[in-house]
Amino acid sequence: MFETLKALNPDPILGLLAAYRQDPNPRKVDLGVGVYKDEAGHTPILECVKQADLAHRAEETTKTYVGPAGDADFDNGIEALIFGADHGARRDQRLRTLQAPGGCGALRIAAELLNRAKAGAAIWVSDPTWANHVPLLGDAGLEIKIYPYYDGASQSLKADAMFAALEQIPAGDLVLLHGCCHNPCGVDLAPADWDRVAEIAVRRGFTPFVDLAYLGLGVGLDEDAYGVRRLASAVPELLVASSCSKNFGVYRERVGALSLLCATPAQADVVFGQAQNVARGVYSMPPNYGAALVGRILRDPAATKAWEGELGAMRDRINGLRSQLSGKF
């Protein structure tokens, strides 16, 4: 059986990391895998995560399954963090959120769900986009299409070309948008751009799908969530795949979520059930430990404040290093 399989080329991201490790140049800079490092080149565990870990270990009484939707405290906490606790979509009970194994798990569950809803649906991704978007979405059966986004020569957004492309996308298609900290180009939509995207989406009838992997690491939590919140206030349907790997530093715990906005609460219940059914057939139950820690932090105001302080320190360091690096060229 296995003799039919062919050797694959190295993953473009992981292959770059391997090349970096083999390069003897002492002045090399690692711009590969998106992992935060401190001044010593170490990826630390946040103090708030350590404290949540201690409390969780002291109180945990079982290792039984949590169900396909995952940890309820985490689901509620991450939804409130992304959309805002008092967002109209939450008040109207049109939002549902389920835990997933990282942002990748959320993307794949969304893709499988969308293909179940409309087989072979077209999803438009930015040029460029994160390398793993194409296999995660395309291998689930979605048709990948591309819209212009970044001008490498001017290092700026191709705003006119992007909006012109969005104006041609038909109803029933999906548009993948980077919520903040666009990977790989780093050029984000301004609030006015998000306003225009929302207006076009409503008028044209396409469904926005936001990948939110870096919430809080761009400008700030509320600023980085502007696009998602603006879309959720305008469109009848929206998908958001989020990750806690970067902003909580829980990379190996695989903590992510898929949030689904639907036109009515009844439709939201149906879609939520379908999403859990998809998850049941892919990985059955999500891992609980990391999500339990994040959920604990988000339900405790003091712990949340401590996390926001640590997140701000990471954000300031990242932005400072980016500024220093750009000054070298």
Regions found by a protein language model. Name each.
Residues 55, 60-203, 216-217, 226:
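Conserved core of the PLP fold type I
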Residues 1-70, 77-80, 287, 291:
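N-terminal "arm"/small-domain region of PLP-dependent enzymes with the aminotransferase-like
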Residues 33, 179, 210-212:
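A cross-domain feature marking catalytic cores of carbohydrate-active enzymes
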Residues 17-24, 119-120, 134, 264-284, ...:
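Conserved C-terminal alpha-helix-loop-beta "cap" of PLP-dependent enzymes
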Residues 37-41, 184-185, 249-250:
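Short catalytic/ligand-binding loop motif for oxyanion handling, primarily in non-cytosolic enzymes
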Residues 233-308:
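Conserved core segment of the aminotransferase class I/II
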Residues 189-250:
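Acidic, glycine-rich loop-and-beta core segments that form the ion-binding/anion-interacting portion
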Residues 29, 124, 145, 209, ...:
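Hydrophobic/aromatic beta-strand patches that form the interior of the parallel beta-sheet core
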